[in-house]
């Protein structure tokens, strides 16, 4: 049986996500993947420059000292920190840790994740700069 009735199709604009702050923040958080791709490509080029000798490495370091590249890398760092913050806030929701018959709140888990991140960063910087 066929019908001539047209089904209702709710109109949806391409800017639907701009209406609520939750969706805007979600799109910003998902957009942190773009700077991550930039950093990955930059890291791969750095590895190839390191492999190709001192002249290639010096050229790569000169590239990194370009003010535009420094600004892009600072934006990438900010995006990585935002992504890390949101990921650390999500982790306690996935973990069900019970101590003495009581579920642990999200604060200790988030603080411990940040502590591990800070310690790992300090160790990596120490090894890179002083080893």
UniProtKB/Swiss-Prot annotation:
InterPro entries: Fumarate_red_C, SQR/QFR_C/D. Pfam families: Fumarate_red_C (PF02300). The keyword Membrane applies. One of its GO terms (molecular function) is succinate dehydrogenase activity. It is found in: Cell inner membrane. The keyword Transferase does not apply. The chain crosses the membrane at residues 30-50, 63-83, 109-129. It comes from the Bacteria. One of its GO terms (cellular component) is plasma membrane. It is a multi-pass membrane protein. Two distinct, membrane-bound, FAD-containing enzymes are responsible for the catalysis of fumarate and succinate interconversion; fumarate reductase is used in anaerobic growth, and succinate dehydrogenase is used in aerobic growth. Anchors the catalytic components of the fumarate reductase complex to the cell inner membrane, binds quinones. Belongs to the FrdC family. This is Fumarate reductase subunit C. It comes from Shigella dysenteriae serotype 1 (strain Sd197). The lineage of its organism: Bacteria, Pseudomonadati, Pseudomonadota, Gammaproteobacteria, Enterobacterales.
């Amino acid at each position: 049986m066929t019908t001539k009735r047209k089904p209702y199709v709710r109109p949806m604009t391409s800017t639907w996500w701009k209406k609520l702050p939750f969706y805007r923040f979600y799109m910003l958080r998902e957009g942190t993947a773009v700077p991550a791709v930039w950093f990955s490509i930059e890291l791969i080029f750095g590895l190839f420059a390191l492999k190709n000798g001192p002249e290639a490495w010096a050229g790569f370091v000169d590239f990194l000292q370009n003010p535009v590249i420094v600004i892009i890398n600072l934006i990438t760092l900010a995006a990585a920190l935002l992504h890390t913050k949101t990921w650390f806030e999500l982790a306690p929701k996935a973990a069900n840790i019970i101590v003495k018959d009581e579920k642990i709140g999200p604060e200790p888990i988030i603080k411990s994740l940040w502590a591990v991140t800070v310690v790992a960063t300090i160790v990596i910087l120490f090894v890179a700069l002083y080893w």
